[in-house]
Design a protein with these regions (language model features):
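Conserved N-terminal entry element of GNAT/NAT acetyltransferase domains
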Residues: 1-18
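Active-site rim helix/loop that mediates acceptor-substrate recognition in acyltransferases
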Residues: 41-64
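Conserved beta-hairpin
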Residues: 57-77
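Conserved acyl-donor/pantetheine-binding loop and adjacent beta-alpha core of acyl/acetyltransferases
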Residues: 74-131, 137, 187-191
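Conserved GNAT acetyl-CoA-binding A-motif
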Residues: 123-125, 152-165
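Conserved beta-strand-loop-alpha-helix junction that forms the acyl-donor binding cleft
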Residues: 128-137, 161-170, 187-191, 197-200
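Conserved acetyl-CoA-binding loop-helix of GNAT-fold acetyltransferases
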Residues: 132, 138-151
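Conserved active-site alpha-helix within GNAT-family acetyltransferase domains
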Residues: 143, 155-157, 166-183, 189-190
């Protein structure tokens, strides 16, 4: 197994996203920000693949999708300049969780309106998603991708933001300087979410 330090982090083109869609869909199959609004579905993995095809395509077109090595891991770091266009592209995507949810997407819309409303008004870089190939986990690849995004945020003198529903990831992100600034349960019985911010390096 290659050490993370041996892997280059490179921007991903839209025509290169297929293996990263697979890696990320598998990693997010139990992520409640997507799984809870989906509800009862016979093939949640296929839905996650469709969701991340839209997410990764939008990020790649904006120069915001990064990979470590040859699809060993992927991170979507959304810059403040790209944020509006990123969300506009997603709103036109009709093949993911919202489209296939058992309630027609009502939970998805309600949850994500709440999530985005918890984001700070200040300009920031957002870690929209991060995933590592299961065969390559625990080798530092996730940290490599996080550090890459934080370096871009630091170059702009801006904070970085993320959210997670996985409590074990809160201390993990804390190792990179992220601190919880808000925590709460999503509306309508939605999942517990931790919102974290990492200030720019001094």
């Amino acid at each position: 197994m290659l050490a993370a330090m041996e892997l280059a982090v490179t921007a991903v083109r839209d025509d290169e996203i297929d293996p990263l869609v697979e890696v990320t869909a598998q990693a997010f199959i139990d992520e409640q920000l997507l799984r809870w609004p989906l509800g009862d579905h016979p093939d949640p993995l296929a839905v996650m693949q469709a969701e991340f095809r839209g997410l990764h395509s939008a990020a790649a077109r904006l120069g915001c999708l990064w990979q470590a090595g040859d699809a060993a891991g992927a991170a979507s770091w959304i810059s403040p300049d790209a944020a509006d266009s990123f969300w506009e592209q997603l709103m036109s995507w009709h093949d993911g969780v919202a489209a296939q949810a058992d309630d027609g997407g009502a939970r998805y819309e309600q949850l994500w309106d709440w999530v985005l409303g918890c984001y700070p008004d200040e300009p920031h870089w957002a870690l929209d998603s991060i995933a590592v190939d299961p065969a390559m986990r625990r080798g530092g690849i996730g940290g490599l991708l996080i550090d890459h995004g934080l370096a871009m945020a630091d170059a702009d003198g801006l904070p970085a933001i993320l959210e997670t529903t996985r409590p074990h990831l809160v201390p993990y992100y804390g190792k990179f300087g992220f601190v919880v600034f808000e925590e709460g349960d999503g509306p309508g019985g939605g999942p517990q979410v931790w919102f974290m911010r990492r200030p720019p390096a001094r």
